[in-house]
A protein has these predicted regions:
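Interfacial/gating helices of multi-pass transporter permease domains
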Residues: 28-35, 57-76, 103, 142-149, ...
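Helix-terminus/linker motif at the lipid-water interface of multi-pass membrane proteins
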Residues: 44-71, 77, 95-96, 133-142, ...
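Short membrane-interface helical motifs at transmembrane helix boundaries
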Residues: 122-145, 149
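Hydrophobic faces of transmembrane alpha-helices in multi-pass small-molecule transporters and flippases
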Residues: 21-52, 56-57, 77-81, 85, ...
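Alpha-helical transmembrane segments of multi-pass membrane proteins
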Residues: 76, 142-168, 187
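Single conserved hydrophobic/aromatic residue that forms the stacking wall/gate
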Residues: 1-11
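Small-residue-rich transmembrane alpha-helices that serve as helix-helix interface/gating elements
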Residues: 5, 151, 207-226
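Small-residue-rich hydrophobic transmembrane alpha-helices
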Residues: 67-125, 129-131, 162-184
């Protein structure tokens, strides 16, 4: 950071930084926390979800928790490109939203959704066709393969909707509605997923527990669609009024 500051002072002399201007601004701080706190909560929710699912699965067999752990590691390779896409999408949407350029905002959202869908379809296809190959990366035993192959195929069904939900969540944050993103994330990983997984575990059939992921994703997709429509409507009004 000091090195970057030094380079900035050398090459950007038109920007002058004075100590008297570095002060606490409650209005700016409020906006930072309004966007940042939901992101912090969403990051922590994943740990709670993992803990809850492990507790539910361990009742059946420790191998089920091993399968879930393997899945959690493998799925990161599918979701990582989506998160990278988000990192590039959010500043573009935020800038053009502030500049009242609706066409660029909606074009960015549309292209991001298409790209996310392609990535997720590829991930879904790999999980459907090569589940045993993926599990063998973890030296899976016969028991682990017997549990893991159907698990990966069932859980990967949720990929088909997950791309849209993740993009929508980032759109909410980019346009200044982080609460929508928080609600969707909480419902997806806690309010729906864990209770449904627990209820399905009461049947005594492990394969049914995996269906809690697609069920939670359907609920997430529904909420994301509703919130996105509201966001689009309000964003259009704001950008049109700014343009006028």
């Amino acid at each position: 950071q000091p090195r970057s500051r030094g380079l900035g002072d050398v090459y950007k002399r038109q920007i002058h930084i004075h100590r008297k201007n570095i002060r606490w601004d409650p209005i700016v701080a409020k906006e930072i926390y309004r966007v940042g706190i939901p992101s912090i909560i969403m990051q922590s929710i994943s740990s709670v979800m993992t803990f809850g699912m492990n507790k539910i699965l361990f009742v059946f067999t420790p191998t089920a928790t091993a399968v879930f752990g393997a899945y959690f590691k493998i799925q990161s390779f599918v979701f990582m490109p989506i998160f990278g896409l988000n990192n590039g999408m959010v500043p573009i949407i935020s800038y053009n939203y502030g500049a009242a350029r609706p066409q660029r905002v909606w074009k960015t959202i549309r292209l991001s959704n298409i790209t996310a869908m392609v990535i997720m379809v590829v991930g879904f296809t790999i999980f459907q066709l090569f589940p045993s190959t993926l599990l063998e990366l973890f030296d899976a035993s016969e028991t682990m393969l017997a549990i893991g192959v159907p698990a990966l195929r069932i859980i990967s069904v949720s990929f088909l909707l997950a791309g849209f939900c993740i993009i929508a969540g980032s759109v909410f944050q980019a346009i200044g509605n982080p609460v929508y993103s928080l609600i969707v994330s909480v419902c997806r990983q806690m309010v729906v997923l864990l209770p449904v997984a627990w209820l399905l575990s009461r049947t005594g059939r492990l394969e049914l527990v995996w269906w809690s992921f697609p069920i939670a994703e359907v609920m997430s997709f529904t909420l994301s669609t509703i919130f996105l429509r509201r966001t689009v409507k309000s964003a259009n009004e704001v950008m049109n009024s700014s343009a006028d």
